[in-house]
């Protein structure tokens, strides 16, 4: 049975956000405090973004947006399929590119980027072809490993140095701008919420509980992680490309000298899990556009096109223009709020017209 439980979907979404959290904190912020305030505001906005998923679940028996659009017309289904396919392509493009770019920051910059992309995409394609329940179980295991790794690193960091809480300040030239940038940044990183829409038909349970649990735990996870990194690294937390990696290198214990290897292991598998879930959903969207499309081919295409674009950008040494571009937050809002509501409105209008015809 291709079903996924509430906890499994929660794990899929949180694993995705954990990867983006481990990847980097943008250097565009003057201090961590304004970023933490922005995270709080963005979470409140994300509560509103979850409303369309709840409406679709209760009013339309949990259809995904593309299937729901098909209830109105074939043309609307095709349009929805194209939009969400491109959304997941962009999602895969950022995941793949960010992974390889920030791998450059940890390892030598002279390894073949294309080979790394092919390796990661091959593993993600394999996972993307699995059933939703398999993706959910894999995410659950990885979420547990991420939690264990985080606890060990934080505990080891506290045992090595004194905590410096003076780094929590609001000394900034433009606090309002910094907070608004943080809000946009978190909305962009939270493209994982789109999973909520496309796992609806396979979900055993209510999206209300999943979204509430995810947003609550995500808020606590991000705030505590940024807080601990700030306490350990100070202002360096906002200038380091990989503050989690820096803290892992800095942390030590009586049994483990450094946590770099653990960081890399958890980070790589989180990237594969996140990309695998993206490819799984992207194949569903391609099916809405081309009903006779082979699923295996759809998953491979969903990985190949974004990967090729990412490699082209990486080889031109121009990935920073993408990595630190926050305009993608509009895509999260559009994909989660506006498009589902427009589709639902078209379906309701058709139902009303059909009811009027029957009543005439």
Model-derived features: positions:
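Membrane helical hairpin/interfacial module
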Residues: 16-113, 122
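Hydrophobic, small-residue-rich membrane helices and short re-entrant helix-turn-helix hairpins
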Residues: 129-142, 172, 176, 194-217, ...
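Helix-loop-helix junctions that connect adjacent transmembrane segments
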Residues: 101-119, 144-205, 235-243, 264
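Membrane-interface "cap" regions at the ends of multi-pass membrane proteins
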Residues: 1-28, 178-183, 203, 346-360
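Hydrophobic alpha-helical segments and their helix-loop junctions in multi-pass secondary transporters
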Residues: 5, 89-100, 128, 146-171, ...
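Membrane-interface loop-to-helix entry segments
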Residues: 114-115, 127-157, 328-339
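Selective recognition of specific alpha-helical transmembrane segments in multi-pass small-molecule
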Residues: 41-53, 85-95, 123-125, 144-158, ...
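Membrane-interface interhelical connector segments
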Residues: 232-260
